[in-house]
From Swiss-Prot:
The keyword Phosphoprotein does not apply. It holds the Pfam family ABC_tran. One of its GO terms (cellular component) is plasma membrane. It comes from Vibrio anguillarum (strain ATCC 68554 / 775) (Listonella anguillarum). It is a peripheral membrane protein. This is Hemin import ATP-binding protein HmuV. SMART domains: AAA. The gene is hmuV. Part of the ABC transporter complex HmuTUV involved in hemin import. Responsible for energy coupling to the transport system. NCBIfam families: PRK13548.1. Its EC number is 7.6.2.-. PROSITE patterns: ABC_TRANSPORTER_2, HMUV. It is found in: Cell inner membrane. InterPro entries: AAA+_ATPase, ABC_transporter-like_ATP-bd, P-loop_NTPase. Signal peptide: none annotated.
Amino acid sequence: MSTTAAIQASNISVTFGHRTILDKIDIEIFSGQVTALLGPNGAGKSTLLKILSGEISSTGKMAYFGVPQALWQPNELAKHLAILPQQSTLSFPFIAQEVVELGALPLNLSHQQVSEVALHYMQQTDISDRANNLYPALSGGEKQRLHLARVLTQLHHSGDKKILMLDEPTSALDLAHQHNTLRIARSLAHQEQCAVVVVLHDLNLAAQYADRMVMLHNGKLVCDAPPWEALNAERIEQVYGYSSLVAAHPTMDFPMVYPI
């Protein structure tokens, strides 16, 4: 597994009014890993993801693949970094495949190539049967899978420098598609050396698919470790205020969290 730092962020702080959202966060995101951002509501997970993606600014320093954030041209960075937000608003009556093809805008591809790449990722995300449906007619879960196909399309020609950020990508999905989405993310990390950052609420999903867990609490980074080190009853009580039992999965090598 690569130890290349795809993102380096130091002394990241964000304040809204009198409220501190993030407080002096230092974090590196590595190629070849799935990093899960965890914590209760309001902990700062989505804000940190937006800072790491460059969507919002903060104090501190940021670099992608060793190059300071300020030196990246937006069009060039878009070839290497894609983000799936919690909600993607689109009111125009595009057909589904056209939405996915929007991900190819930063790429220098022919119309035929764009169509082929879009359909490839629609098949991966199990949404190809809706290719000719109008976007507004899709269900919430179908839209979420469609936008996942769009951001995967965006990274199609990113080579060995790619970052995928997913903000609660399983929130509208059924059980099978939750696991399919995270299997895709893990495959990108382990097979294509993508740096994957995913915001999740389900600790058991995070334990199964993440290489590394970063926990936030009241805007502070309180844990950065592999699942077996990160998950214990004391820490879950500290971060979530909830009593739990942590035990090994009966057949697979990851910890499970059981409420008590």
